[in-house]
């Protein structure tokens, strides 16, 4: 009898606890996960944008830029290496029938390697500002013209597939005239 009572209590606790939580927050698990991952990804984007804005302003030394790039590669969450993790989480929340969002996921899986590779180039630049500037230009080109517009598509796809999730868009570094416009400006 004790085993049956325990089994029923366990079943009731695990079965009914989740819907109660959902009713209390008003969000489905998918909507909550979508919102959490979008917010986390926006934090990551803001950190990378901050670095790119400082690099464009020319207010830090080559050594400082190298150290900041290393931080973006090593620190998680809130860093460049966390963005692919956010991509994978949100890709699982996008409907496979959403061809636009799924194409953006595929693009980002390829493109992120270029951003991370260029951050590594900055870290290993040996305080050579020409190398750093070249790598920053390549990162800006990738982010302004491909990464940020694709992230917007992933955000839209995840939100569309998870009612209750909050719509969001990205913003680029100051050098992006308009993400996806095909141009950026770097001094």
Predicted regions located by residue number:
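Mature, structured extracellular domains of secreted fungal proteins
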Residues: 18-187
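Fungal secretory targeting signals
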Residues: 1-25
């Amino acid at each position: 009898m004790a085993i049956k009572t325990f089994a029923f209590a366990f079943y009731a606790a695990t079965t009914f606890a989740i819907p109660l939580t959902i009713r209390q927050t008003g969000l489905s698990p998918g909507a909550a996960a979508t919102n959490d991952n979008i917010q986390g990804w926006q934090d990551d984007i803001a950190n990378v944008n901050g670095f790119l804005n400082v690099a464009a302003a020319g207010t830090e030394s080559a050594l400082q830029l190298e150290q900041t790039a290393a931080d973006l590669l090593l620190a998680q969450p809130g860093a460049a290496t966390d963005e692919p993790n956010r991509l994978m989480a949100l890709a699982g929340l996008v409907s496979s029938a959403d061809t636009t969002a799924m194409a953006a996921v595929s693009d980002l899986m390829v493109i992120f390697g270029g951003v991370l590779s260029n951050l590594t180039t900055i870290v290993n630049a040996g305080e050579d500002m020409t190398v750093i500037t070249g790598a920053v230009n390549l990162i800006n080109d990738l982010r302004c013209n491909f990464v940020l517009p694709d992230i917007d598509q992933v955000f839209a796809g995840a939100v569309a597939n998870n009612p209750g999730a909050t719509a969001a868009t990205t913003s680029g570094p100051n050098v992006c005239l308009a993400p996806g416009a095909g141009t950026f400006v770097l001094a």
